[in-house]
């Protein structure tokens, strides 16, 4: 069985849908952050697949930049969640309604 571009795009779409469903359905900020990372990894998978099957390495280079930005996003996101937890003692998205501490 030959694994083609369609298989990778379908897998990427499924991962993206799982991440989107997690963001919509869950209310915990840490879970929302993890689901956002799943969505970014789905986009990375699609970029690498298109890059591989079109014999162009620019998509793979772009993935390295996306991974770098995602790592910075996780660091800032977790720092914000920890700061909010110290003040509000919760990580539920609906409990955090004020824009300032």
Swiss-Prot record:
Primary site of residence: membrane
One Pfam family linked to the record: Oxidored_q2
Transmembrane helix keyword on record: yes
Reactions accelerated catalytically: a quinone + NADH + 5 H(+)(in) = a quinol + NAD(+) + 4 H(+)(out)
Keywords attached to this entry: Cell inner membrane, Cell membrane, Membrane, NAD, Quinone, Translocase, Transmembrane, Transmembrane helix, Transport, Ubiquinone
Assembly behavior: NDH-1 is composed of 14 different subunits. Subunits NuoA, H, J, K, L, M, N constitute the membrane sector of the complex.
Gene3D superfamilies given in the database record: 1.10.287.3510
NCBIfam families assigned to the protein according to its UniProt record, in alphabetical order: PRK05715.1-2, PRK05715.1-3, PRK05715.1-5
One CC-aspect GO term: plasma membrane
GO annotation, biological process: ATP synthesis coupled electron transport
GO MF: NADH:ubiquinone reductase (non-electrogenic) activity; quinone binding
Role, per record: NDH-1 shuttles electrons from NADH, via FMN and iron-sulfur (Fe-S) centers, to quinones in the respiratory chain. The immediate electron acceptor for the enzyme in this species is believed to be ubiquinone. Couples the redox reaction to proton translocation (for every two electrons transferred, four hydrogen ions are translocated across the cytoplasmic membrane), and thus conserves the redox energy in a proton gradient.
Name of the molecule in the record: NADH-quinone oxidoreductase subunit K
Enzyme class, UniProt record, top EC level: translocase
Membrane-topology annotation of the record: Multi-pass membrane protein
Domain of life per record: Bacteria
EC number: 7.1.1.-
Subcellular location: Cell inner membrane
Similarity field: Belongs to the complex I subunit 4L family.
Membrane spanning residue stretches: 5-25, 30-50, 61-81
